[in-house]
């Protein structure tokens, strides 16, 4: 199937091949772990087990910020594992979430009652908390604060539905916006980035909301099948009586209309995303922040006006993901990528869609205010001979490429 997808996108196949043959190391270099303590090595092992995608970009970060963000990620992954575990009673879960930040200072605390797939980060939490206490105080302060605020926010929604659009923003702030705020404060504390990066809470929050809303939109069917509801009732309630009924074939038209409205809401975070990325100076930090954002806009474009969201999984192509990862290394390239995908959405807006005017307005504003000089990326320079060579190479090499690292696919799977 991936071979067939590549037939229409030879440049993506070329990038897949280049990535597999060593191009990955040009922007995600392998980290030398020989000098690490055994506990820190274990932390990186857990990082790779829970998220290969984040592991790759975290390990490419410069200096001591790399270890701080590794620990930050694992602490929040442990917290998130408690939130996701439906086998934990509400009575037990709420105090666990609210008090989780205090466990960072308890060398013995661990939780062995989880049934979740990532439960090892709870069962071996002493290893993670040890490395937390080994961090510089400036990093500990940020991680403690974000963990505390996130735990309390998660507790608020344990037994509460996402009803209004304000609730949606609030929930996404707790589970993702705070991550963006925490990362930004860590970047500034490390002095790799200017103080404004950590001080502008609104832009940092939007970075997280853009990613989280994209995940929630794309994962409608998976969440429904697992009994989770993250789409705001204020929106879907205008289209249908029960959220789960969007999956019924007879409701596909109103389902897509609701989908388009939520995507339009999410696109409004793009100006803040561009402002945030434009302030970054360290290349490794820029890559770390930019790659998920361009993956998100590509995912939104794939989901827009797409009935498949309610029937199965919508994912961007592996070659597309690799191309985005390799291209999104500077601000002009990121702007061009975002312009490309918002134009793709714009040209697919149905005139009959209830949100069509709003969607056009949002995209036009982004074009004018944030992307005034951008043009669509053209790859028409590939000659017929070159294309023929690519296709032949594809046929000969596909079996080899089928073993491509999962790092690219993880970027388009939900992060918990």
From Swiss-Prot:
Membrane-topology annotation of the record: Multi-pass membrane protein
Knockout or disruption consequences: Deficient mice are embryonic lethal around midgestation (9.5-10.5 dpc). Embryos exhibit severe growth retardation and defective neural tube closure.
Main location: endoplasmic reticulum
Pfam name, any one: SQS_PSY
GO molecular function (one): squalene synthase [NAD(P)H] activity
Keyword set, alphabetical order: Cholesterol biosynthesis, Cholesterol metabolism, Endoplasmic reticulum, Isoprene biosynthesis, Lipid biosynthesis, Lipid metabolism, Magnesium, Membrane, Metal-binding, Multifunctional enzyme, NAD, NADP, Steroid biosynthesis, Steroid metabolism, Sterol biosynthesis, Sterol metabolism, Transferase, Transmembrane, Transmembrane helix
Catalytic activity: 2 (2E,6E)-farnesyl diphosphate + NADPH + H(+) = squalene + 2 diphosphate + NADP(+); 2 (2E,6E)-farnesyl diphosphate + NADH + H(+) = squalene + 2 diphosphate + NAD(+); presqualene diphosphate + NADH + H(+) = squalene + diphosphate + NAD(+); presqualene diphosphate + NADPH + H(+) = squalene + diphosphate + NADP(+)
Sequence similarity: Belongs to the phytoene/squalene synthase family.
Protein name as it appears in the record: Squalene synthase
């Amino acid at each position: 199937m991936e071979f067939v997808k590549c037939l229409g996108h030879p440049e993506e196949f070329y990038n897949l091949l280049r990535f597999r043959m060593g191009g990955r190391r040009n922007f995600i270099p392998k980290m030398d772990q020989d000098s690490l303590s055994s506990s820190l090595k274990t932390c990186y092992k857990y990082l790779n087990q829970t998220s290969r995608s984040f592991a790759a970009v975290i390990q490419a970060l410069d200096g001591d910020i790399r270890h701080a963000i590794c620990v930050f990620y694992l602490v929040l992954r442990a917290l998130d594992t408690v939130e996701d575990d439906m086998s934990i009673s509400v009575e037990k879960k709420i105090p666990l979430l609210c008090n989780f930040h205090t466990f960072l200072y308890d060398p013995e605390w661990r939780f062995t009652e989880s049934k979740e797939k990532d439960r090892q980060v709870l069962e071996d939490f002493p290893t993670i908390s040890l490395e937390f206490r080994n961090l510089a105080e400036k990093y500990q302060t940020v991680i403690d604060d974000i963990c505390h605020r996130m735990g309390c926010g998660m507790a608020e929604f344990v037994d509460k539905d996402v009803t209004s659009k304000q609730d949606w923003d609030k929930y996404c702030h707790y589970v993702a916006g705070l991550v963006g705020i925490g990362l930004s404060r860590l970047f500034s504390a490390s002095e790799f980035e200017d103080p404004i990066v950590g001080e502008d809470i609104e832009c940092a929050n939007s970075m997280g909301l853009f990613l989280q809303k994209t995940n929630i939109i794309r994962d409608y069917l998976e969440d429904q099948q697992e009994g989770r509801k993250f789409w705001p009732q204020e929106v879907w309630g205008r289209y249908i009586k029960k959220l789960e009924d969007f999956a019924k074939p007879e409701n596909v038209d109103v389902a897509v209309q609701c989908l388009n409205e939520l995507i339009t809401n999410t696109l409004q975070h793009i100006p803040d995303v561009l402002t945030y990325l434009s302030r970054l100076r360290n290349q490794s930090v820029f890559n770390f922040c930019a790659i998920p954002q361009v993956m998100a806009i590509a995912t939104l474009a794939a989901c827009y006006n797409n009935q498949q969201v309610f029937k199965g999984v919508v994912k961007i192509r592996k070659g597309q993901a690799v191309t985005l990862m390799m291209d999104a290394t500077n601000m002009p390239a990121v702007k061009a990528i975002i312009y490309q995908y918002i134009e793709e959405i714009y040209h697919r807006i149905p005139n009959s869609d209830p949100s069509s005017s709003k969607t056009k307005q949002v995209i036009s504003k982004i074009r004018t205010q944030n992307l005034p000089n951008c043009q669509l990326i053209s790859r028409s320079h590939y000659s017929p001979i070159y294309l023929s060579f690519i296709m032949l190479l594809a046929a000969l090499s596909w079996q080899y490429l089928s073993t491509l690292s999962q790092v690219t696919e993880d970027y388009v799977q939900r992060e918990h």
